[in-house]
Amino acid sequence: MSVPRARLLQLVKARCELFSTTFNPEGIRTGNKILRQRLKGPALATYYPRKNVGIRELQKEFGTLGLEVDDEVDDDRLEHLAALRARDKGAPKKKRTAPSAADAKKKK
Protein backbone atom coordinates (compact mmCIF):
# COMPACT_ATOMS: atom_id res chain seq x y z
CA MET A 1 0.00 0.00 0.00
CA SER A 2 1.64 3.23 -1.19
CA VAL A 3 1.17 6.70 0.15
CA PRO A 4 0.00 9.41 -2.30
CA ARG A 5 2.67 11.90 -3.47
CA ALA A 6 0.73 14.90 -2.16
CA ARG A 7 0.73 13.41 1.34
CA LEU A 8 4.50 12.79 1.18
CA LEU A 9 5.06 16.41 0.08
CA GLN A 10 3.04 17.63 3.07
CA LEU A 11 5.20 15.51 5.34
CA VAL A 12 8.43 16.85 3.79
CA LYS A 13 7.14 20.43 4.05
CA ALA A 14 6.30 19.99 7.73
CA ARG A 15 9.73 18.43 8.36
CA CYS A 16 11.43 21.38 6.64
CA GLU A 17 9.52 23.87 8.77
CA LEU A 18 10.34 21.91 11.91
CA PHE A 19 14.09 21.60 11.25
CA SER A 20 14.53 25.00 9.51
CA THR A 21 15.64 23.61 6.15
CA THR A 22 14.60 24.69 2.67
CA PHE A 23 11.66 22.98 1.05
CA ASN A 24 12.67 21.91 -2.45
CA PRO A 25 10.23 19.31 -3.78
CA GLU A 26 11.50 19.44 -7.40
CA GLY A 27 15.14 18.93 -6.36
CA ILE A 28 16.30 22.07 -8.16
CA ARG A 29 19.93 23.02 -7.58
CA THR A 30 19.87 26.08 -5.33
CA GLY A 31 23.49 26.40 -4.17
CA ASN A 32 22.62 26.08 -0.48
CA LYS A 33 25.50 23.66 0.05
CA ILE A 34 27.99 26.27 -1.14
CA LEU A 35 26.29 29.17 0.64
CA ARG A 36 26.32 27.34 3.98
CA GLN A 37 30.09 26.81 3.86
CA ARG A 38 32.43 29.11 5.74
CA LEU A 39 34.00 31.93 3.76
CA LYS A 40 37.46 31.15 2.40
CA GLY A 41 38.66 34.73 1.95
CA PRO A 42 40.31 35.26 5.35
CA ALA A 43 42.09 31.89 5.18
CA LEU A 44 43.42 32.63 1.70
CA ALA A 45 44.51 36.12 2.70
CA THR A 46 46.61 34.77 5.57
CA TYR A 47 48.19 32.04 3.40
CA TYR A 48 50.75 34.37 1.85
CA PRO A 49 53.12 36.23 4.18
CA ARG A 50 52.90 39.99 4.38
CA LYS A 51 55.20 41.87 2.04
CA ASN A 52 58.25 43.40 3.68
CA VAL A 53 59.18 46.97 2.94
CA GLY A 54 62.11 47.22 0.54
CA ILE A 55 64.60 49.88 -0.47
CA ARG A 56 62.52 51.01 -3.46
CA GLU A 57 59.44 51.57 -1.31
CA LEU A 58 61.53 53.67 1.09
CA GLN A 59 62.92 55.70 -1.81
CA LYS A 60 59.41 56.33 -3.15
CA GLU A 61 58.06 57.28 0.25
CA PHE A 62 60.88 59.49 1.49
CA GLY A 63 62.34 60.75 -1.80
CA THR A 64 60.49 64.03 -1.45
CA LEU A 65 62.39 64.76 1.78
CA GLY A 66 65.71 64.71 -0.04
CA LEU A 67 67.01 61.62 1.74
CA GLU A 68 69.37 59.46 -0.28
CA VAL A 69 69.14 55.72 0.14
CA ASP A 70 71.66 53.40 -1.51
CA ASP A 71 70.25 50.23 -3.00
CA GLU A 72 73.30 47.98 -3.22
CA VAL A 73 71.48 45.19 -5.02
CA ASP A 74 70.22 47.55 -7.71
CA ASP A 75 73.63 49.22 -8.02
CA ASP A 76 75.27 45.81 -8.50
CA ARG A 77 72.70 44.93 -11.14
CA LEU A 78 73.33 48.15 -13.06
CA GLU A 79 77.11 47.64 -12.88
CA HIS A 80 76.71 44.11 -14.21
CA LEU A 81 74.57 45.32 -17.12
CA ALA A 82 77.08 48.07 -17.93
CA ALA A 83 79.88 45.49 -18.00
CA LEU A 84 77.85 43.28 -20.34
CA ARG A 85 77.16 46.21 -22.67
CA ALA A 86 80.85 47.11 -22.70
CA ARG A 87 81.61 43.60 -24.02
CA ASP A 88 78.66 43.75 -26.49
CA LYS A 89 76.88 40.98 -24.58
CA GLY A 90 73.94 43.05 -23.35
CA ALA A 91 70.39 43.27 -24.64
CA PRO A 92 70.00 44.82 -28.09
CA LYS A 93 68.82 48.41 -28.38
CA LYS A 94 65.15 48.95 -29.08
CA LYS A 95 64.13 50.24 -32.50
CA ARG A 96 62.95 53.84 -32.42
CA THR A 97 61.01 53.84 -35.72
CA ALA A 98 58.01 51.87 -36.86
CA PRO A 99 58.72 49.00 -39.27
CA SER A 100 58.44 50.08 -42.90
CA ALA A 101 57.37 48.12 -45.98
CA ALA A 102 61.02 47.73 -47.06
CA ASP A 103 61.84 46.01 -43.76
CA ALA A 104 59.01 43.53 -44.29
CA LYS A 105 60.31 42.52 -47.75
CA LYS A 106 63.81 41.68 -46.49
CA LYS A 107 64.68 38.00 -46.28
CA LYS A 108 65.61 36.81 -42.87
Swiss-Prot record:
Segments passing through the bilayer? none
Q: Which InterPro entries match?
A: Ribosomal_mS33
Q: Where in the cell is it found?
A: Mitochondrion
Pfam families to which the protein is assigned, alphabetical: MRP-S33
Predominant place of localization: mitochondrion
Q: What keyword terms does UniProt attach to this protein?
A: Mitochondrion, Ribonucleoprotein, Ribosomal protein
One Gene Ontology cellular component: ribonucleoprotein complex
Region of interest: Disordered: 84-108
Specify whether Mitochondrion is a keyword of the entry: yes
* Subunit: Component of the mitochondrial small ribosomal subunit (mt-SSU). Mature N.crassa 74S mitochondrial ribosomes consist of a small (37S) and a large (54S) subunit. The 37S small subunit contains a 16S ribosomal RNA (16S mt-rRNA) and 32 different proteins. The 54S large subunit contains a 23S rRNA (23S mt-rRNA) and 42 different proteins.
Q: Which family does it belong to?
A: Belongs to the mitochondrion-specific ribosomal protein mS33 family.
- Task performed by this protein: Component of the mitochondrial ribosome (mitoribosome), a dedicated translation machinery responsible for the synthesis of mitochondrial genome-encoded proteins, including at least some of the essential transmembrane subunits of the mitochondrial respiratory chain. The mitoribosomes are attached to the mitochondrial inner membrane and translation products are cotranslationally integrated into the membrane.
What is this protein's name?
Small ribosomal subunit protein mS33
Q: Which organism is it from?
A: Neurospora crassa (strain ATCC 24698 / 74-OR23-1A / CBS 708.71 / DSM 1257 / FGSC 987)
